[in-house]
Curated annotation (Swiss-Prot):
It comes from Mus musculus. One of its GO terms (biological process) is actin cytoskeleton organization. GO terms for cellular component: actin cytoskeleton; cytoplasm. Signal peptide: none annotated. Expressed in testis. The lineage of its organism: Eukaryota, Metazoa, Chordata, Craniata, Vertebrata. It is found in: Cytoplasm, Cytoskeleton. This is Fascin-3. One of its GO terms (molecular function) is actin binding. Acts as an actin bundling protein. It holds the Pfam family Fascin. Belongs to the fascin family. CDD domains: beta-trefoil_FSCN3_rpt3. SUPFAM superfamilies: Actin-crosslinking proteins.
Amino acid sequence: MAEVDWIHRHPKAEDLRVGLISWAGTYLTFEAYKSSVTASAKSLGRRQTWELLVSNEHESQAVIRLKSLQGLYLLCEADGTVCYGRPRTSHHGCFLLRFHRNGKWTLQCIISGRYLESDGEDVFCNSRVLSAYHMWTPRPALHVHVILYSPIYHSYARADHTVGRIWVDAAIPCLEECGFLLHFQDGCYHLETSTHHFLSRVDRLVPQRSSQTAFHMQVRPRGLVALCDGEGGTLYPQGSHLLLGMGSAPMKGEEWFVLQHFPTWVSLKSKSRRFLSVIYDAEVCAASERLTQMSLFQYECDSETPTLQLRSANGYYLAQRRHRAIIADGHPMESDTFFRVHWNCGKITLQSPNGRFLGIASDGLLMANVTIPGPNEELGIRFANRPFLVLRGRYGYVGSSSDHDLLKCNMDQPDCIQLLPCRQGIYHFQAQGGSFWSITSFGTFRPWGKFALNFCIELQGSSLLTVLAPNGFYLRADRSGTLLADSEEITKECIWEF
């Protein structure tokens, strides 16, 4: 079977959400208990996150609605007040969104012609004369661990630490070098690589964040972004090797990237400690003792149902075929590509659409031929493209603060949790300074332990997981902002985006 071109997936709804920052540095906020919209929040959370619904788009403007995560829309009334609810007419809640050269947005009510503005606390639509008070800075609300895809070159950005550069030449985003952390600070963005280096304005990777690593971001609906220096320079792929560098003359569209959440790639090991790999273009066999690109699988799982699709680096999905064989030749919507996943202490068993479990046959091939699973059908699973985790829960990111000695779960800026694999599904959590996570008798955590502890990770979706702590309880985001391990059951507060 010939390898297919890697098909770039369109951004998901969560990749297209934004926060809107007023001239005063505060966020447009959905206030459920006040039945109103304000701009008083200092950080980006669930109530400050808005989905853009685009009905018409041109180069410098678009007609949009803003929808909150609660399912209600931003509405401008005839008297200039701004509230939320459901549109009463086809134009109610529609805004003309204009993109300005400085990266700011303005939102003009389609019905009244008045601009959305804030006084730093309240939000209203009173004036038809444009001013600085009507400017809003868009901030992408997706998880900070991202990939950058060039729709012009059909390739992904990749950090090359051997030469300290970033190239836009990766056909498949399966390596950790394709992942970047997008830090937002003082209105600018810093692009951090998987080895914790930063892209600078002189096109090289440097070890420290500084003014030379700060970029302004142009944001468009549908997940498009461009990074620039604010002085006429823009980042875009250059030369025959597509070096990501600063320049002033990109060809039309070269500077735009699709910003998406970093996908999850895993490796799977049989009981004989051999990697599952795609061989002869399509057969899946547990034969390799060495990890190769054909041993990597993109983990695509619906968080609402325990069904899993595994996408091989050849562009196809694992599927059950004739004679119960598992072949990497499936397509996205085929029913034979959906497997039921069962977790057990960091390992998984996979159940095919015919109800049988996947196991390794005597010739090493992966087959769906077992009715009652046992240890031989368990597969060890490990992250293949993530040397660290960045966890985001219901109240913010997991991180440390100089004001608290305990790890918090409501931070705007995250800490990186270095992963030290111990056994399949079991990891040690290491803090940024090289110390380990330690747990107190109250189920709270400190980031300066001397000894490594075991944490069990189980995937709950394509980019969702739960963590079983050393005390036998699940990690939970508490409303107070303290990270706790005190939950016997998996609740919404135990689900972490990574």
